[in-house]
């Protein structure tokens, strides 16, 4: 039976082994020093969304190069394929990866390259949903403009992050602009 996964977190599904390998490669000490990385990333018993999201600080730190992003996207789609998924929609906040060596177009291209490699090997269709961080109005505004600029390379837009005190209604002008420009909203 074919399955679809809609609304997965790209930065929330790194393989533990990949996280460890990338941490060593990138000299990212907070994860190099973790003895049981699988346990570290298992946040199922988190008492709050904020506690659950704490692990994302470390995964996004590893998503700072084209090669890392491409690998992570490929492996995410590959893992979905191994679970019988044929349609995979993944969301990511691109500004977390922008740095002196990586612009937003590189971020989007790297993720799509990983997805395309997985499609060529496994036939899984994957798409990228860009996320603005709801606890940062400027971030949401900027990512919504990026979504419009790159609408041919993404499948939608979403807001992510802590929900308390950050209602979707705070971003109605961005949502209206996105809708007027044909961007799907999740």
Q: What are the functions of these language-model segments?
A:
Residues 1-183:
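Metal-cofactor-binding active-site regions of metalloenzymes
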């Amino acid at each position: 039976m074919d399955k679809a996964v809609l609304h997965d977190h790209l930065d929330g599904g790194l393989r533990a082994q990949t996280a460890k390998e990338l941490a060593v490669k990138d000299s990212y000490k907070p994860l190099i020093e973790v003895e049981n990385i699988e346990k570290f990333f298992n946040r199922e018993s988190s008492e709050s969304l904020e506690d659950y999201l704490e692990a994302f600080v470390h995964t996004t730190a590893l998503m700072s190069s084209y090669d890392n992003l491409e690998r992570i996207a490929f492996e995410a789609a590959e893992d979905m394929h191994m679970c019988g998924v044929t349609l995979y929609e993944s969301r990511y906040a691109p500004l977390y990866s922008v740095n002196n060596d990586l612009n937003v177009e590189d971020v989007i291209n790297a993720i799509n390259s990983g997805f395309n490699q997985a499609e060529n090997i496994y036939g899984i269709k994957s798409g990228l949903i860009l996320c603005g961080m709801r606890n940062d109005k400027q971030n949401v505004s900027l990512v919504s403009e990026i979504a419009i600029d790159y609408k041919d390379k993404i499948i939608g837009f979403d807001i992510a992050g802590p929900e308390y005190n950050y209602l979707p209604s705070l971003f109605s002008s961005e949502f209206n602009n996105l809708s007027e420009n044909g961007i799907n909203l999740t």
